[in-house]
Regions:
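Acidic, divalent-metal-binding catalytic cores of TOPRIM
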Residues: 1-225
Length: 225
């Protein structure tokens, strides 16, 4: 809700509610808002946001186990609960994987928006909000007297990585390896974004992952007369 408010699409004004379905699953939630008879479609636009759940190839070593810097040491696909980009042998296979995600909830006025790269937090960092994410992570993990130095330390560590993928994966490792609460980080991130971008919504919009912008736009679009 904070992001939508900052970029001038306040969910409250549009009558939009946010629901975290968590373990319920998109498909079950979407079915509540879909009708068996297409002629009785509910006149309610619904955006379902979900992770892509495909790691960049660098992420297993950064976010799971350092040994996985050698792909030969990865467990067989059938014996692990994660996927990486190199698991797909063709673009067609990637496209089919994405289609299956979309099919879980798409239909009638319900539309699914899948993370452009991996997860919500990773995509925020990848798209341009890495510094804000660092600040939020530090606010959750460290006492106020240590935060300024911790931010510098993490930023310096990020500079050691060769590309945006590995830098963003490193920031995600604070959740996957170090147990940082995503919910608490989200709360702090909301405050940080509002403080930094309330007077410059265009700058925030430019730094948002495209799928988040699209999901917000879909539920706040004005209907044609």
């Amino acid at each position: 809700p904070t992001i939508s408010k900052i970029i001038g699409k306040d969910f409250t004004e549009y009558g939009v509610s946010v629901v975290n379905v968590r373990g319920t699953g998109l498909r079950r939630f979407a079915k509540i808002l879909q009708r068996a008879d297409a002629g009785e479609t509910l006149d309610i636009r619904v955006s379902c946001m979900t992770d892509r759940d495909v790691m960049p190839n660098c992420a297993p070593a950064i976010c799971i186990d350092q040994r996985y810097s050698d792909i030969a040491l990865w467990p067989e696909k059938e014996k692990r609960n994660w996927k990486a980009e190199c698991d797909f042998i063709s673009q067609n296979e990637r496209d089919l994987y994405l289609e299956r995600i979309l099919e879980r909830a798409n239909g009638q006025r319900v539309k699914t928006f899948v993370a452009n790269h991996w997860t919500f937090e990773y995509d925020l960092a990848y798209a341009g909000l890495a510094d804000e994410l660092i600040e939020a992570i530090v606010a959750v993990r460290y006492e106020s007297k240590n935060r300024e130095q911790r931010i510098k330390d993490i930023q310096k560590k990020c500079e050691e990585f060769p590309d945006n993928e590995s830098k963003s994966a490193y920031l995600y490792s604070f959740f996957s390896l170090k147990g940082t609460s995503k919910a608490e980080v989200a709360q702090h991130l909301s405050f940080i974004l509002e403080t930094k971008y309330a007077s410059d919504p265009k700058a925030l919009c430019e730094r948002l992952p495209p799928y988040i912008r699209d999901a917000i736009n879909y539920v706040t679009e004005q209907e044609d007369a």
